Amino acid sequence: MFTKLIIAASLAASVAAHATFQELWINGVDQGSSCVRLPQSNSPVTSVSTPDLACNASPHPSDGICQVMPGDEVTVEMHQQPNDRSCATEAIGGDHYGPVLVYMAKVDDATTAVGSSAQWFKVAEIGLPSSNPDYWGTEVLNDNCGHYTFKVPSDIAPGNYLIRAEVIALHVASSIGGAQFYMSCYQVNVGGSGSANPPTVSIPGAYSATDPGILINIYEPLSTYTIPGPTPYATTSPAVANTPYPTTATWNTALQPSTVPTAVPTPGTPGIGKA
């Protein structure tokens, strides 16, 4: 009964707590929404088989392409409402706990590429870095004013890419179709002279509705959490800061936070995700 009450409360709160990825930073420089395909609304996708899972449901087109180099620090930024970048409001609220994931896909033209036809490789993720107490990837966003920072792999081939930032909210994921997927696609051009072509997956296709990281009751005690999708390209498992959330986590090799932030960053400063 207690679990049912929690789930019911989460459903009620979720109506006002949806969110979208809206802005991009490159090496600490704010690009705003200049190269993002902004979703039509902040409502989630709930099917793992719909083409909308790639870049959201009929997002607004963009003719902007942001320029990045291999090794650049890229920050995706999420907020509940369009044009509201206030740090006073949670990036995604209503107990929308779950992982944050970032994918990339090489495409011929980032402004016209169809996300559901692209081939994606994961470059960063954060799930449940602490289970005592529970501390989710979405809380990293909330503690960093909606920011999550990763590095562009240092060896990928130059050209146009889509960057897909995603949150999977698990507050009502104890039944099939309950998980909520929030994603946006950013359009970038990667420079340099790399040649790597990482292993890829299709989206949709990378997830199953019964994956243990998608069909899950997060209100039961959890000691571990399996992040959906493939392993991030070029990963390692370093020890992370031992206070206040002692744990280890799988990260993109390029970016390891040296400390756990203790305060919410002020607007205008991209935060680096905690582990």
From Swiss-Prot:
Modified residues (Phosphothreonine): 20, 50
Motif 9res motif, residue numbers: 268-275
Residue numbers of Phosphoserine PTMs: 43, 49, 58, 130
GO cellular component, one term: extracellular region
UniProt region (X282 extension), positions on chain: 236-265
Binding-site residues for O2, renumbered to this chain: 171, 180
GO MF: metal ion binding; monooxygenase activity
Transmembrane residue ranges: none
Major site of localization recorded for this protein: secreted
Subcellular location: Secreted
Binding-site list for Cu(2+): 18, 96, 182
Family: Belongs to the polysaccharide monooxygenase AA9 family.
Function, as annotated: Lytic polysaccharide monooxygenase (LPMO) that depolymerizes crystalline and amorphous polysaccharides via the oxidation of scissile alpha- or beta-(1-4)-glycosidic bonds, yielding C1 oxidation products. Catalysis by LPMOs requires the reduction of the active-site copper from Cu(II) to Cu(I) by a reducing agent and H(2)O(2) or O(2) as a cosubstrate.
Protein name: AA9 family lytic polysaccharide monooxygenase AA9-X282
Lineage: Eukaryota, Fungi, Dikarya, Basidiomycota, Agaricomycotina
